[in-house]
Curated annotation (Swiss-Prot):
A GO molecular-function annotation: microtubule binding
Similarity comment: Belongs to the TRAFAC class myosin-kinesin ATPase superfamily. Kinesin family. KIN-13 subfamily.
Sequence ranges of Low complexity compositional bias: 82-92
Polar residues biased stretches: 69-81
SUPFAM superfamilies according to UniProt: P-loop containing nucleoside triphosphate hydrolases, SAM/Pointed domain
Name under which the protein is recorded: Kinesin-like protein KIN-13
Length: 714
């Protein structure tokens, strides 16, 4: 089996490290469990070699029964160092970025005929420059894969390669190359159903229908207890099914942004979704999270970029910062969670005072920083998840000029706090409810900023971007203006118990992307949003927007095509979602046709105006409570400082009267003045506390009213 380890290393041109592996007693079983932190102990220090080993191990992990698939090496008595070159190397999965030489890569291409490669020849070339590739132009062993052909490429022996070549998730080449130029891209990731959900007899109700469409088969029960399935269909830029891994997500969603960063653009990748849907796994996984994979490529691109610059003053260095937004406040995760302040300078730029920024030179250095920061991140239990992230974690990698320190560009990786329905947090304590309201408000503000950014991209005069709507959008202001690109990864859970949250996630993502309809890019499939947008209820702060036109269309088999709702021309006055609901035509009933598992007829949704108003009021009240909290904390600090000053004056006055340095009359006057000022400071603080207690009591009563309203509907 030691020959097998040598063959694996040889396939990646890492055979020179085999003695260290042999000395450490690395078996094939241990080989595939090696982590990045172990590379140093094995003598692997060079960044290109670390990349090769990382991709080799990831490839081997992705192939099922890798050890059983390998033929037993003949026992000829030869040492691993003397293994002849004629030994067959392990089959290299599609998309591997390590090859031995030009002939070896050509052999791989002939054997699989499913992957396009472009060469890395030391020049600064983008990874997606052409849909036609013919292998490396020289013998360099580092190549950057592009996307495979579709739909003509044959199915690989293992659909879990890197990247996964699943015919249901691979977009057309020409369309994908056009997509990555868009300022906004929205992709969906479906996680696998887990054993706990299966043990609870939960069903998978999410299907990825092709590379850009997802369907939700929502189980429902009518008033007469008749069960039926309501079908919801959405289309996005890309849909990843449960077989997709982080490598594939990064390859298609985030990697194109790396090129944009080196073009001077500010880029943002954020993961959104219900708690437990895989956001942190996608963004912050310590071995193959998107930020880890991006750091590999950023450092490699940076080496190439700096090598192409003749002037040292144009050299760039990566600088990392990591902070969280919790309860509307900023905390530095690289400095023991110290409080930060987001302030605007005279030019209108947002500056985060006190933020720790550390220059990195390797992936290991960044991993150590992030691991220490993640231990400080705020988590808590909700009705949706027992270990929910209650803060937005923002990791920023800025490229700065070496000499001047001026920022050239920046890429932000955002692991958003979990989005829950109002009912998921209403039965929790006040702190959890307030956290949920603040989270939902910031998520709504983020959506509105992205949509406004899209409007400004189409408008000659530009549209106002409401980045002051929350602390999240305020600190990300540079990502919403100027030359910027954004990718949203919406994570969804497949089980039927999370169906409501899954639908709300998709509706949120659909609202982010809906303005792309009718433009020169993707033509979206119009999907009916039933009645008042349910996402508005969940977010708790959305209001009827008279300037929005909800693109409506009935998804079902009983409505005739001519009777589907139409969007009015742009010249007509815009209408609201409620008006569309009222103006929908009556469904066409066919008594002789009742397909199975489909909704027999369209049932109008019961209006929930009172509940909507209460949820909105609750969110506004929570926002006011957070503002009052900051004011009271500052008032308390002023009161303490004032008391300390008065105590000093009182002690000095006491010494004076004891030493006969002041007359009794003067002592009485000064002491009376000190006590009056003490009483005034205490009275003022107590008044602030009384108003704050009333706001908390009102929040408690409003939350209880929402619970009662939901209980009556059940």
């Amino acid at each position: 089996m030691s020959d097998l380890v040598y063959q694996w290393l040889e396939s990646a041109n890492l055979q020179q490290y085999y003695p260290a592996f042999e000395q450490q007693g690395i078996t094939p079983q241990r080989f595939i469990t090696i982590t990045i932190q172990d590379y140093g102990a094995l003598g692997i220090q060079a960044l290109p070699d670390k990349q090769k080993l990382f991709r080799l191990i990831t490839t081997l992990k992705s192939r099922e029964n890798i050890l059983e698939q390998q033929p037993s090496a003949p026992n000829t008595g030869a040492t691993p160092q003397s293994v002849p070159s004629s030994h067959v190397s392990p089959h290299v999965a599609q998309g591997d970025r390590f090859v031995g030489d030009k002939q070896k890569q050509n052999d791989i291409q002939q054997a699989q005929d499913m992957s396009l490669y472009e060469s890395y020849d030391g020049g600064y070339e983008p990874p997606y420059v052409s849909a036609q590739g013919s292998g490396p132009a020289n013998g360099d062993d580092y190549v950057i894969p592009t996307i495979p052909y579709h739909p003509n490429a044959p199915n690989p022996p293992n659909p879990r390669g890197i990247p996964t070549v699943n015919r249901t998730v691979v977009p057309p080449v020409d369309l994908f190359l056009n997509q990555i130029q868009s300022r906004i891209r929205v992709v969906i990731r479906k996680r696998p159903i887990n054993p706990k959900e299966l043990s609870q007899n939960q069903r998978d109700v999410v299907t990825a229908d092709g590379w850009n469409q997802v369907s939700i088969h929502e189980p429902k029960v009518k008033v007469d207890l008749t069960k039926y399935t309501d079908l919801h269909t959405f289309k996005f830029d890309h849909v990843f099914n449960e077989q997709s891994d982080n490598q594939e997500i990064y390859q298609y969603a985030a990697k194109p942004l790396i090129r944009s960063v080196f073009e001077g653009k500010n880029c943002t990748v954020f993961a959104y979704g219900q708690t437990g849907s895989g956001k942190s796994f996608t963004m912050m996984h310590k071995d193959n999270g998107i930020y880890v994979l991006a750091c590999f490529d950023i450092l490699e691109y940076l080496r190439v970029y700096n090598g192409s610059q003749g002037n040292n003053s144009k050299f760039l260095v990566p600088v990392v910062s990591f902070f969280e937004i919790y309860g509307g406040k900023l905390f530095d995760l690289l400095n023991n969670r110290q409080r930060l302040q987001a302030l605007e300078d005279g030019k209108g730029n947002v500056q985060i005072t006190g933020l720790t920024e550390k220059q990195i030179s390797s992936v290991d250095a960044m991993l150590n920083l992030i691991d220490s920061g993640l231990t400080l991140r705020a988590v808590g239990a909700t009705g949706a998840n027992a270990d929910s992230s209650r803060s937005h974690a923002i990791l920023q990698i800025a490229l700065k000029y070496t000499k001047s320190g001026k920022e050239y560009s920046r890429i932000s990786f955002i692991d958003l706090a979990g989005s829950e329905r109002a009912s998921d947090v209403q039965n929790s304590d006040r702190q959890t409810r307030m956290e949920g309201a603040e989270i939902n408000k910031s998520l709504l503000a983020l959506k509105e900023c992205i949509r406004a950014m899209d409007k400004s991209n189409d408008s000659k005069s530009g549209a106002h971007i409401p980045f002051r709507g929350s602390k999240l959008t305020m600190v990300l202001r540079d990502s919403f203006i100027g030359n910027s690109q954004t990718v949203m990864i919406a994570n969804i859970s497949p089980n039927d118990k999370s169906c409501d949250n899954t639908l709300n996630t998709l509706r949120y993502a659909d609202r982010v992307k809906e303005l792309q309809h009718g433009k020169g890019g993707i033509i979206k499939f119009n999907v009916l949003k039933m009645g008042q947008n349910a996402a508005d209820v969940i977010l708790g702060t959305a209001r009827d927007d008279e300037n929005d036109v909800y693109k409506a269309g009935i998804v079902g088999v009983n409505a005739a095509p001519s009777q589907q709702a139409r969007v009015p021309p742009a010249s007509q006055a815009p209408i609201t979602a409620r008006q569309i609901q009222q103006n929908l035509p009556q469904p066409h009933y066919n008594p002789n046709y009742n397909p199975p598992n489909s909704k027999p007829a369209f049932e109008p949704r019961v209006e929930t105006t009172d509940e909507d108003d209460m949820v909105r009021t609750h969110c506004d009240l929570v926002d006011s409570i957070y503002e009052q909290e900051d004011l009271i904390v500052r008032a308390h600090r002023r009161q303490v400082d004032s008391m300390m000053q008065l105590v000093k004056e009182e002690v000095a006055l006491l010494h004076a009267i004891e030493n006969d340095q002041v007359s009794i009359d003067d002592w009485l006057v000064k002491l009376s003045d000190i006590l009056s000022r003490k009483e005034e400071a205490i009275t003022t603080l107590k008044g602030n506390l009384s108003a704050f207690k009333q706001a908390l009591q009102k929040e408690e009563e409003l939350s209880h009213s929402i619970d009662l309203n939901k209980a009556r509907k059940k």
